[in-house]
A protein has these predicted regions:
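P-loop/Walker A NTP-binding region and its immediately flanking N-terminal helices
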Residues: 1-171, 181
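Extended, largely alpha-helical regulatory/partner-binding modules appended to the mid-to-C-terminal parts
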Residues: 23, 76, 80-87, 105, ...
Length: 248
């Protein structure tokens, strides 16, 4: 079954995250010292690593064998979170769950201790989409959270998040990625996937990505799919091509 490249190559640990060293270094230091906030707010344009870092942080706080603040990726907790089967680490899309009732359900469930991991983690993506009533309900649990609870909020529109929420979160700004940072990652993915692509094409995709790694990988995927489909059709008639070549 084909897997989108941006999912296949999503960062699994802090060292995999491109272009956000100040963020990842600070998070690792907090994890090593145990000086974690109860609520984080990740801000920045789309595709800069906010959700990926949120998931890595969720693994790190629950990892059974952490290494200098980084999750091992191998223990049962890490694997369950990676597979999306951990019921105590929940990712919520505020764009489609923006009402007060959704947040009240979250708030009611948050009081229970986690069943299989150390901390219950709520990752709320595009948090700026919550209604005013939903923000007020969220504020009540963020103000006095249980010790076993961690909130990680992510937004592309910081100005729409109420000041009452901002003041109770530790904020991290994710910067737009440079074209050379994106190009380096695209070259790595192309090599791993046996996609033969001209350097000029990689550089063009990196510029078109406009600072977002996810868009860059999606563009690479879209260009490669044309040759993948051709290769599949040729395989049906027993003709093979050794590599996929992408020239823009």
């Amino acid at each position: 079954m084909y897997q989108a490249l941006y999912r296949k190559y999503r960062p699994q640990t802090f060292s995999d995250v491109v272009g956000q060293k100040s963020v990842t270094d600070t998070l690792r230091a907090q994890l090593e010292t145990g000086k974690l906030s109860h609520a984080y707010l990740f801000t920045g344009t789309r595709g800069t690593g906010k959700t990926s870092c949120a998931k890595i942080l969720a693994k790190a706080v629950n990892c059974e064998n952490p290494n200098h603040g980084a999750p091992c990726g191998l223990c049962p907790s890490c694997r369950a979170i990676d597979e999306g089967s951990c019921m105590d680490v929940l990712e919520i899309d505020a764009a489609s769950n923006n009402g007060v009732d959704s947040v009240r359900v979250l708030r009611d469930d948050a009081i229970y201790t986690p069943g299989t991991v150390k901390m219950r983690v709520y990752i709320i993506d595009e948090v700026h989409m919550l209604s005013t009533a939903a923000f007020n309900a969220l504020l009540k649990i963020i103000e006095e959270p249980p010790a076993h609870l961690l909130f990680i909020l992510a937004t592309t529109e910081l100005q729409k998040v109420p000041a009452t929420i901002l003041s109770r979160c530790q904020r991290f700004a994710f910067k737009r990625l440079r074209p050379d940072e994106i190009a380096s990652r695209l070259n790595f993915i192309a090599y791993q996937e046996h996609i033969e692509i001209e350097p000029e094409a990689i550089n063009l995709l990196a510029r078109l990505a406009d600072g977002g790694m996810r868009d860059g990988v999606s563009l690479l995927c879209a260009q490669a799919m044309e040759t993948i489909e051709k290769q599949y059709m040729l395989s049906l008639i027993h003709i093979s091509e050794p590599t996929r070549r992408v020239v823009i």
